[in-house]
Amino acid sequence: MLSPEAERVLRYLVEVEELAEEVLADKRQIVDLDTKRNQNREGLRALQKDLSLSEDVMVCFGNMFIKMPHPETKEMIEKDQDHLDKEIEKLRKQLKVKVNRLFEAQGKPELKGFNLNPLNQDELKALKVILKG
């Protein structure tokens, strides 16, 4: 039987390890989804270079090739890209929360600037006007 102090340390280490595993799993999933997104981007680029819209194209699904119409293929890949973008953005938001929880569990201060959002077009124009003037 462990002493109360040893049990407390063990619980702390288990909690930190679980949080770190969640962070690493999310990072790995983001990398995997980004790889798929890049492959889709390559496919879209190849479809744009091929100007023969009337012909069918060969598409690889896993380990199987299927012949599909050019416009439907492009639309399908674009929908997949939108889905991947949303999924990656959702994972990144979750990752920020999980990293903050991990830092909190470790007793470290919250990362400064980690929750910043980019300026939109209107904000950027207003900032340029202010800086010029």
From Swiss-Prot:
Domain of life: Eukaryota
CDD domains, per database record: PDRG1 (cd22860)
Single GO biological process annotation from the record: protein folding
Annotated GO CC locations: cytoplasm; prefoldin complex; protein folding chaperone complex; RPAP3/R2TP/prefoldin-like complex
Induction: By UV irradiation and repressed by p53/TP53.
Pfam families in alphabetical order: Prefoldin_2 (PF01920)
Gene Ontology molecular function, alphabetical: unfolded protein binding
Localisation: Cytoplasm
Cytoplasm keyword on record: yes
InterPro entries: PDRG1, PFD_beta-like
Presence of the UniProt keyword Zinc-finger in the record: no
Keywords: Chaperone, Cytoplasm
Tissue expression remark: Predominantly expressed in normal testis and exhibits reduced but detectable expression in other organs.
Summary of the function given for this chain in its UniProt record: May play a role in chaperone-mediated protein folding.
Subunit structure: Component of the PAQosome complex which is responsible for the biogenesis of several protein complexes and which consists of R2TP complex members RUVBL1, RUVBL2, RPAP3 and PIH1D1, URI complex members PFDN2, PFDN6, PDRG1, UXT and URI1 as well as ASDURF, POLR2E and DNAAF10/WDR92.
PANTHER family for this protein: P53 AND DNA DAMAGE-REGULATED PROTEIN, P53 AND DNA DAMAGE-REGULATED PROTEIN 1
Similarity comment: Belongs to the prefoldin subunit beta family.
Full protein name: p53 and DNA damage-regulated protein 1
Gene name per UniProt: PDRG1
